[in-house]
Amino acid sequence: MERIDGVAVGLCAHSPYLRPFTLHYRQDGVQKSWDFMKTHDSVTILMFNSSRRSLVLVKQFRPAVYAGEVERHFPGSLTAVNQDQPQELQQALPGSAGVMVELCAGIVDQPGLSLEEAACKEAWEECGYRLVPTDLRRVATYMSGVGLTSSRQTMFYAEVTDAQRGGPGGGLAEEGELIEVIHLNLDDAQAFADNPDIPKTLGVIYAISWFFSQVVPHLSLQ
């Protein structure tokens, strides 16, 4: 997962996942404009494996995070790209710079698929757990990336067991996914969320906090 080489950067001319726009508007009589991206809505799912007394998370390489870390360490690395020809980065970082711990998640891009069905699909593809929509509890729906996008993300929770794990997970190779499934012991979860040295998403921190607030008081952890 962390063996990354041959990194080159070019301008994005077309993407099925995002599209840039500029919104022009007048606010209190003042003419303004704002750049934004149209992106897909998404779902995340926090799973608690009661057989292992652990939270099910995923770890994967995120190219955008990696590129941002390269620019942060070597300012100007992304400014000289050519739209016609991607340029290899002259200075790079180890692949670990782009690896994140996250919730199982995915974009909602299939017409006719409910949010619950999309979450079940991701639970199987990424983590190997078989779920049906009735297994899910909706935690929250919120806006993500409000300065740049208008996408909504919906978080679900499900309690699972080892018996529901029928596959290895790992994501879909044909979609470029390479995912490691993590079973985080409950005894370590809060320290994990509080540790600033472990690269993780805000969703993981929120989900763990929600779990200990809303679920743990009602669990039998004997």
UniProtKB/Swiss-Prot annotation:
The gene is Nudt14. CDD domains: NUDIX_UGPPase_Nudt14. Gene3D superfamilies: Nucleoside Triphosphate Pyrophosphohydrolase. A motif (Nudix box) lies at residues 111-129. One of its GO terms (molecular function) is UDP-sugar diphosphatase activity. The lineage of its organism: Eukaryota, Metazoa, Chordata, Craniata, Vertebrata. InterPro entries: NDP_pyrophosphatase, NUDIX_hydrolase-like_dom_sf, NUDIX_hydrolase_dom. Homodimer. This is Uridine diphosphate glucose pyrophosphatase NUDT14. It catalyses: UDP-sugar + H2O = UMP + alpha-D-aldose 1-phosphate. It comes from the Eukaryota. Keywords: Cytoplasm, Hydrolase, Magnesium. PANTHER family: UDP/ADP-SUGAR PYROPHOSPHATASE (PTHR11839), URIDINE DIPHOSPHATE GLUCOSE PYROPHOSPHATASE NUDT14 (PTHR11839:SF15). Its cofactor is Mg(2+). One of its GO terms (cellular component) is cytoplasm. Transmembrane segments: none annotated. It is found in: Cytoplasm. Its EC number is 3.6.1.45. Hydrolyzes UDP-glucose to glucose 1-phosphate and UMP and ADP-ribose to ribose 5-phosphate and AMP. The physiological substrate is probably UDP-glucose. Poor activity on other substrates such as ADP-glucose, CDP-glucose, GDP-glucose and GDP-mannose. PROSITE patterns: NUDIX (PS51462). Belongs to the Nudix hydrolase family.
